Amino acid sequence: MSSVSSTIIQDIKTICETGRALIGYFYFDFRDVNKQHWRHLVPFLITQLSSRSGPHFDILSRLYSDHDSGARQPSDNFLTKCLKEILTLSDQWPIYLIIDAVDECPNTSGILSPREMVLQFVKDFVDLRLPNLHICVTSRPEIDIRNVLDPLTTYQVSLHHQSGQKKDIEDCSVCCLLKGFGADHEKVEEGGQRPRNRDAL
């Protein structure tokens, strides 16, 4: 996980501990096949978000029972519907979704690559226009990713090997914490050479 995402997550977790708020986060990793696909992202977010209250847990329990007590895998559409239901049910709380390192999701050839599915997922949830939903996406500035995210983004932070990087991270964290209007969505781009250890930008 990148240092900028770690900073944002820790700040938001502090808010979640002192008040009613929900956080879900996922990071892609080209070294781990379990962290390279949209199908791993959505169940992870569902589990995180549904663990905070009774109504959310009821949705998770229904998902389990509707698929023969876990014997059958739910379809992509069913998982997406379940996540949307959780987000809609949580309209009284701020919700923060952090998706880290989208560039490490494979962009393979085919009808729809794993990366394209993730980008479509982000677009679909931004289009929900939930006033309490805040989405932060981090990635290297690759063209296909920018083409999708740039039109959706209200706040961007570019991290390069230049002075002021620490301030950018702090600004992005504050932005995620304080913006409370519209379906806010932030994008953080990493510049320069990708480090092997994503904790050390």
Where do the protein language model's features map onto the residues?
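Conserved NB-ARC/NACHT P-loop NTPase core of NLR-like innate immune receptors
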Residues: 1-201
